[in-house]
Amino acid sequence: NDIEASTLYRPENVQLDADDKENLKLMNLFDSHISQAFFGGKILIVEGDTEYSAFNYIREKESLSNEHYHDLNIIRARGKVTVASMMKVLNHFKNKYYVLHDTDTQQCLSKRINKDLSSDKHKVYDTITITNPAWTNNNKIKAQMTNKSRVIASLINFESAYFAETVESDKPENCINNIK
């Protein structure tokens, strides 16, 4: 007589704030396959399209001769802001998972309208240095790290870390060409 059991999870125990809930709703709208992360296999959360393209390409190539990759679920977070929200959910379900995200830079340049020099017909912008909003999400990701997660951060971004180059457009295509 084998005993079988199911584990029940209470959603109210997971500490999702309003931003987390909104992030996850938007993720589900963009990628309805996100739920595959909860149904077994290895889970790799990647920040964006470039990482997603790279790991899908590698998985497809490697899985031809290696069963190790057949149950790898690569989940595209579609931006760093969603990564920590996804980690909260996976932590709640006590899933083991991996995360790859960019560190980005601490500061970045932004443009602000110079009201003194601008008119209705002609806008003049000043370039200013600001705290990079993407950088602030690193602490949110770090706060969600557990013994069930392994988080790897690409210094500045994926292209700089692995290909030693800065790419402005066609990043996924450029990435695949570098891997080939």
Model-found features: residue ranges?
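Acidic, divalent-metal-binding catalytic cores of TOPRIM
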Residues: 1-180
